[in-house]
């Protein structure tokens, strides 16, 4: 007997991806550029599911930069030294002084997890990913600047 139709073999449905927990990280930070040189601490909270992002950059006991927001309500960057307080619907539309530019929270996570980004090189890696990152680029006025990051803490 010849079957009239063939039933495809059962295929397992792809498992629904579990929601990723927010990433919390802390980095030693170094900067060299037209605004001078400095060192400090960069604290990062990224929730890729909502686009929530909080970046705090401290140097010598003062906050140099605060960036916060999410995809739904937009992002805000504050740089007290430069009297900068700016909002934008997307992360890529904001200036990020003292840091490599990223277009989205996902791009920031990719940079921190893999070291991939324009002008970024990884100088040291471990099982979790990049430990030391170096970025070389230009500021908005075309002056060269560099940033060094060294991972101190990573939580997922």
Set out the residue ranges of the language-model regions:
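N-terminal leader/targeting segments and the immediate start of mature chains
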Residues: 1-43, 121-126, 154
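Polar alpha-helical coiled-coil and adjacent low-complexity
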Residues: 5-7, 22, 82-83, 89-101, ...
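One face of beta-strands
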Residues: 23-29, 36-44, 51-55, 73-75, ...
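Hydrophobic lipid-interacting interfaces of membrane-associated proteins
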Residues: 28-34, 60-62, 80-82, 140
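Short, solvent-exposed secondary-structure boundary motifs
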Residues: 30-37, 54-60, 109-116
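Short, basic/low-complexity N-terminal boundary segments at the transition from targeting/disordered tails
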Residues: 44-53, 104-110
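An acidic-aromatic
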Residues: 50-103
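Gly/Pro-enriched, hydrophobic low-complexity segments
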Residues: 106-156
């Amino acid at each position: 007997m010849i079957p009239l139709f063939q039933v495809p073999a059962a295929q397992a449905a792809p498992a629904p991806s579990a929601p990723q927990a927010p990433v919390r990280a802390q980095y030693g930070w170094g900067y060299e550029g037209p605004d001078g040189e400095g060192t400090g601490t960069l604290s990062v909270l990224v929730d890729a599911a909502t686009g929530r992002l909080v970046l705090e950059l401290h140097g010598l006991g003062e906050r140099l930069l605060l960036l916060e927001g999410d995809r739904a309500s937009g992002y805000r960057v504050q740089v007290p030294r430069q009297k900068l307080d700016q909002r934008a619907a997307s992360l890529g539309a904001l200036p990020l002084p003292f840091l490599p530019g990223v277009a989205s929270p996902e791009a920031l996570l990719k940079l921190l997890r893999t070291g991939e980004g324009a002008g970024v090189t990884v100088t040291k890696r471990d099982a979790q990913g990049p430990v030391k990152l170096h970025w070389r680029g230009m500021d908005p006025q075309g002056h060269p600047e560099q940033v060094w990051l060294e991972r101190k803490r990573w939580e997922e």
